[in-house]
Amino acid sequence: EMFVNSYKSEIGLLNNVFIRFDVVEGDLISKFYKASNYYSESSGTLGNSCMKYKPSYYFDIYAKNPEKIKMVILYDEDGQISDGKYKSNKIMARALLWNTDQGDMVMDRIYSYQDKDVELFKRFAEKNGWWCKKTQDSECNFISQRGEENKKVKYYTISLKEFDTEYYPYVDTFAYFDPKNGILSNSQGLTDKDKSNYTHYMSNTDGTIAMTRYMDGDGDDEDDDN
């Protein structure tokens, strides 16, 4: 009985915290990249993001593809419920959410003010049936986690409808880009033909895009953050 009550209590606490989660898309993605909307502009992996002061148009490729790219955010505790939804002006954490061509919803690297919120994001992903990165880094070859399930990810693709843009964001995981067909991937591909298509790599933080022929298999900028 004590175990059951403890379990119910934990579920209740999680449900209360989950109220503060939201999934946004379009121009709201660039909004919540901005440091002015962070709970703290200088603390945690969120406050240390290298993209926090970048202009909104750097994120156009996200905003123009809402069916493929969204963002999961955790609001701070200073908000309020309006029309049944919790809203606040500041966020405690964020992570991109990718709708892959392979059918998996994958939550990317989690940027948070507090380390403990990483586990909350993983639980929120599990609740929604999404996969997430087991380790919070910029590795393209990663282990994907969903609750107790784990799998080694070799090759995901994200086919974009709108990809003609002048500026590009730094991307942690799905950084390989086929500009001819508008496809993002966490790998240059499984065949030589695939590798010849992924000619670009989103590893720069100044709005430009790198060429893969100058990059090694994992990307030279794996320690940068998004």
State where each predicted segment sits.
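Non-catalytic substrate-recognition and accessory regions of acyl/acetyltransferase enzymes
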Residues: 1-226
